[in-house]
Regions:
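Interface amphipathic segments
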Residues: 1-251
């Protein structure tokens, strides 16, 4: 193809003009400097950029700073920092320039809203709170594979407040698989591992010193219980099967 030899500066251009190119809704003002050589089929170069007061795929930002290099048909993100009202994100790694756009990314999130991350993934689970998260993203832009570890705090699951929840997870675009999950909830602790699908739960759980009055509000039950078993059903209507033990229960 024809050769490329481009360089220039941009100042406060509207990010929305890049929405079609990136495949994501974008807003804000972009400034930067770039150099691109090679060809359309094999470009190489680099860019430094900043963006202010905008949004990328539902994530609001006050400021973005980044450096990207082009080569070997990849965009290599050597540094990208996003700061906004919902937290801070740092991104490093590579994105393929051409379909299917292979991904190798590491994303560190410092105190952001769980609801925003779920919305970014196109999910709507009844979970709120703050989360610190480290994830790696592989696969392709059309079919990303995500794995990571997280610490969530000061939030709720299905309306029940929790102090903190931590664990390791994978996400394949449809199912979330959790390993070594530890939650401080219902005035006790919960250890969970398994899979959550949009229409089904398949998890092994161990609940220790759980408050019945917190877990079953309005049912007249009181006391502390230990439960070990399996949870099925859905997020809206979970079903627990397994033994229950307690030193004292009042109903």
């Amino acid at each position: 193809g024809p050769s490329l030899s481009l360089s220039g500066d941009v100042s406060s251009i509207d990010l929305s003009v890049l929405s079609g190119l990136s495949g994501m809704d974008m807003a804000g003002r972009l400034s930067g400097r770039f150099v691109v050589n090679g060809s359309r089929e094999d470009p190489y170069g680099a860019a430094d950029f900043t963006a202010q007061d905008g949004e990328i795929h539902g994530i609001s930002f006050d400021r973005i700073e980044g450096h990207v290099s082009l080569g070997d048909q990849l965009a290599t993100i050597t540094s990208l920092h996003l700061e906004g009202p919902d937290g801070k994100h740092t991104v490093k790694g590579t994105v393929g320039l051409f379909a299917p756009h292979p991904l190798t990314l590491t994303i560190d999130t410092d105190k952001t809203r769980i609801e925003k991350l779920l919305a970014l993934a196109g999910e709507d689970y009844p979970v709120t709170g703050w989360v610190e998260n480290t994830m790696t993203v592989t696969g392709t832009m059309e079919a990303p594979q995500v794995k990571g570890d997280f610490l969530a705090f000061d939030g709720s699951v299905m309306g029940e407040l929790f102090q903190s929840i931590s664990g390791e997870y994978t996400y394949d675009g449809n199912d979330i698989t959790l390993k070594n999950g530890l939650a401080y909830i219902y005035d006790g602790t919960a250890i969970v591992s398994g899979t959550v699908k949009p229409d089904m739960i398949d998890m092994d759980v161990s609940l220790n010193d759980i408050s019945l009055s917190r877990m079953l509000p309005g049912r007249g039950a009181d006391g502390k219980v230990n439960m070990r078993g399996h949870v099925s059903g859905t997020m809206e209507d979970p079903v627990f099967e397994g033994p229950i033990s307690s030193r004292q229960i009042s109903v």
